[in-house]
Amino acid sequence: MNNLLLINASPRGQGSHGNQLALELVSSLRQRYPHLELVERDLGANPLPPLGMDYAHALTTPTPFDAPLFEVSEGLIGELERSDALLIATPMHNFTLPAALKLWIDYVLRIHRTFSSGPEGKVGLLKDRPVHVLVSSGGFHQGERARQPDFLTPYLRQVLNTLGLFDLQFTYLQGLVFGDEAVRATLDEARSALSLQPLFNPLVCA
């Protein structure tokens, strides 16, 4: 049975345009895959505990699983490992990731657990699976109207590659601060693009 992990990184939670589009996509996927199971992690509604000295110290000890925060890390990694596909809905904050998504990354990107490191660099330990990222922004950072840099896309791509995830797609919702008409236009454009290339085509029903 197919398993989809949805990460909502917006502090606006269910009210974010990215998350609303993500839930539309989930509904569409369920029509194609009736047995699809959804695991939704809302990082805004249910924030993760901050990392501190105890966690940093545990990373360097021979028995790291004694640290309570490692239970959080293992739980998040387990959600990722059990998923057949990953859908991330995230805003762009100050040219890059929101703090909530960065914290999720810090929990799941763990040496000797989700990646190894050797003379040739870091190697992901997770099995590859399709990943789709919905990026929402008030301004424009892609295309002819771009007026700001995008550090989110290359950084998140590198993080996912380090985990072992290479089947990546990004969809951008831009110009969301320019009123209701602009919001409708960017959502319609995204829906149109996604209709031409259905999400997670490689998934098969169990």
Curated annotation (Swiss-Prot):
Cofactor(s) demanded: FMN
Gene Ontology MF annotations: electron transfer activity; FMN binding; oxidoreductase activity, acting on NAD(P)H as acceptor; oxidoreductase activity, acting on NAD(P)H, quinone or similar compound as acceptor
Entry superkingdom: Bacteria
Entry keyword set: Flavoprotein, FMN, NAD, Oxidoreductase
Top enzyme class: oxidoreductase
Residues that coordinate or bind FMN: 10, 136-139
The record's free-text note on cofactor binding: Binds 1 FMN per subunit.
EC number(s) reported in the record: 1.6.5.-, 1.7.1.17
Entries under InterPro entries matching the protein: Flavodoxin_fold (IPR003680), Flavoprotein-like_sf (IPR029039), FMN-dep_NADH:Q_OxRdtase_AzoR1 (IPR050104), NADH:quinone_OxRdtase_FMN_depd (IPR023048)
Catalytic activity: 2 a quinone + NADH + H(+) = 2 a 1,4-benzosemiquinone + NAD(+); N,N-dimethyl-1,4-phenylenediamine + anthranilate + 2 NAD(+) = 2-(4-dimethylaminophenyl)diazenylbenzoate + 2 NADH + 2 H(+)
Subunit structure: Homodimer.
Family: Belongs to the azoreductase type 1 family.
Function statement: Quinone reductase that provides resistance to thiol-specific stress caused by electrophilic quinones. Also exhibits azoreductase activity. Catalyzes the reductive cleavage of the azo bond in aromatic azo compounds to the corresponding amines.
Protein name: FMN-dependent NADH:quinone oxidoreductase 4
Gene source species: Pseudomonas fluorescens (strain ATCC BAA-477 / NRRL B-23932 / Pf-5)
Taxonomic lineage from the root: Bacteria, Pseudomonadati, Pseudomonadota, Gammaproteobacteria, Pseudomonadales
